[in-house]
From Swiss-Prot:
Organism: Psychrobacter arcticus (strain DSM 17307 / VKM B-2377 / 273-4)
Ranges of residues in domain Radical SAM core: 216-453
The protein, known as: Ribosomal protein uS12 methylthiotransferase RimO
Binding sites annotated in the UniProt record for [4Fe-4S] cluster 2: 230, 234, 237
One GO cellular component, as annotated: cytosol
Family: Belongs to the methylthiotransferase family. RimO subfamily.
Keyword Transferase: yes
SUPFAM superfamilies: Radical SAM enzymes
Source domain of life: Bacteria
Length: 525
């Protein structure tokens, strides 16, 4: 097996560059190697970066967006259709927004360009979550203007239209997040829709775009957004000001899309929102009919219905509320992937109170232990903020002690940074940057050891894995188990695969070895 290339391993704090979204037979993430040091040695002596990421960035360049949509639009009957370039930045929720806009544009007859030169106009879907994301978005707008000249801006940073226009006065239009219709109208204003009535061969009823729409992810997994906005007012976060309060989709709408995705060949659904466990609260858990059955727009009911589809269902952005216990019972019954992405953010009650985190008074350790009693195989991923204003060494040590007892499977961390408009900016006793970084390193070193220990326990066991990529030259499949969300968690590297193994296929493998974050397995056809 080839030597590991630590230079290309994604780190936790550096912005990540996404791999190509299309299924491929050439590995692009990094070349794996079975570890030559013990886990205890490697966490101390090696310089391998921390692999689990805090953010869920799903950035797509103009080339990646064009490549991902080419199969759906390449056979367009209007050969001279105008081409729209698309740059998508930010989280999976923003990626879903981009997918919807691209789908609607394609249905209107536009094609998606793969480069700036070939685009009649470029749409940039921005992120405004943290200052580094704001700067990245402003840079992307500038690049699009420089290389194309006709640019429409949408997404979370669109809330700051004055800032965008001050820096980039040449932009044609600015809209906010999930403003689909506004974007479509702005595109049509500056690049008129093709007149498909002039093409006698065009029949919208047999349009190549299926009910699931165009996806910017590989064909075997997709993000399913169940709600928009958030009712919480965490002091470090400005998402409610960018995306509004909680607005849930009716459950029949969610299930129709989920079924369409399954029919399109999707093997794994990643459920996303700002607060997945609050799903349906704004609808007062309204009952709808789907597939001839009454269903409540409620978190538990949705999980039950999704399970019945018979594909992998992975839950992201869940809060540790008591009603999540019932969903863990479904996992214990093997009816959902036993995986929870829960942003705990901290463990010190004093800091959680300053953050105004929901459920901060809950005994989260007791809840985690109870979940493991119900479902011993459950995997818990979380993110944490270190160096929040007012965080003392005692507060930080509380977090480290909590991690030792919690033994989470996947952890990412941010060092706190000010975000324009966040309440936390005005809190006293900001932590010096060097102290933030030192605490970040201590947290991630501790968690690296925990991760290594937990993965060592997998050696000798069998796991079902989903193939994401294949390196035919090395004979290695880059896969994920139920414990691994795409692009943010670890991988399972499977040796000596044969020509019959395909991307998007499930394999049952035996775990032979482990490193701090990844597993290494063998497969017998």
């Amino acid at each position: 097996m080839p030597k590991i290339s630590t230079e290309s391993v994604n780190t936790t704090i550096a912005p990540s560059q996404p791999a190509s979204t299309a299924p491929k037979d050439t590995a692009t993430l990094f070349n794996p190697a079975k570890p030559t040091a013990t886990p205890a040695q490697s966490s101390i002596d090696s310089v391998q970066p921390y692999h689990h990421k805090a953010n869920h960035n799903q950035n797509r360049s103009i080339a990646q967006s064009g490549d991902a949509t080419s199969s759906a639009t390449a056979s367009s009957s209007v050969t001279a259709a105008p081409k729209i370039g698309f740059v998508s930045l930010g989280c999976p929720k923003a990626l879903v927004d981009s997918e919807r806009i691209i789908t609607e544009l394609s249905r209107d007859g536009y094609q998606v360009a793969s480069d700036y030169d070939g685009a009649d106009l470029v749409v940039v879907n921005t992120c405004g979550f943290i200052e580094s994301a704001v700067q990245e978005s402003l840079d992307a707008i500038g690049e699009a203007i420089s290389k194309n000249g006709k640019v429409i801006v949408t997404g979370c940073l669109g809330k700051e239209a004055d800032k965008i226009r001050e820096m980039h006065p040449a932009v044609l239009a600015v809209t906010g997040a999930h403003a689909y219709d506004e974007v479509i109208r702005a595109v049509a204003l500056h690049v008129p829709k093709p007149d498909r009535s002039l093409d006698a061969s065009y029949d919208p009823k047999i349009d190549l775009i299926n009910e699931a729409g165009i996806k910017l992810t590989p064909s075997h997994y997709a993000y399913l957004k169940i709600s928009e906005g958030c009712n919480h007012r965490c002091t470090f976060c400005i998402i409610p000001s960018l995306r509004g309060d909680l607005v849930s989709r009716p459950i029949d709408s969610v299930m129709n899309e989920a079924l369409a995705l399954k029919k399109a060949g999707v093997k794994e659904l990643l459920i996303i929102s700002q607060d997945t466990s609050a799903y349906g609260l704004d609808l007062k858990y309204k009952t709808s009919f789907w597939n001839g059955m009454p269903l409540k727009s409620k978190f538990y009911d949705l999980c039950q219905a999704l399970n019945d589809l018979g594909i992998w269902v992975r839950l992201h952005y869940v809060y540790p509320y008591p009603h999540v216990d019932k969903v863990v019972e479904l996992m214990g019954e093997k009816k959902l992937l036993p995986y929870l992405d829960i942003p705990f953010q901290h463990a010190s009650h004093r800091i959680l109170k300053a953050m105004k985190r929901p459920a901060h008074s809950e005994n989260t350790l007791a809840r985690i232990h109870a979940w493991r009693e119900i479902c011993p195989d459950i995997v818990i991923r979380s993110t944490f903020v270190v160096g929040f204003p007012g965080e003392t060494e005692e507060d930080f040590q509380c977090l480290l002690d909590w991690l030792v007892e919690a033994r989470l499977d996947r952890v990412g961390a941010f060092t706190y940074s000010e975000v324009e408009g966040a309440v936390a900016n005005d809190l006293p006793n900001h932590v010096p940057e060097d102290v933030k970084q030192e605490r970040y390193e201590r947290l991630m070193t501790l968690q690296q050891d925990i991760s290594a220990q937990k993965l060592q326990e997998k050696i000798g066991k069998t796991l079902m894995v989903l193939v994401d990529e294949i390196d035919r030259e090395e004979g290695v499949a880059i896969c994920r188990s139920y414990a691994d969300a795409p692009e943010i968690d670890g991988h399972v590297y499977v040796d000596d695969i044969d020509a019959h193994v395909k991307v998007g296929q499930f394999l049952t493998v035996t775990i032979d070895d482990a490193s701090e974050y990844d597993l290494f397995a063998s497969y017998q056809a």
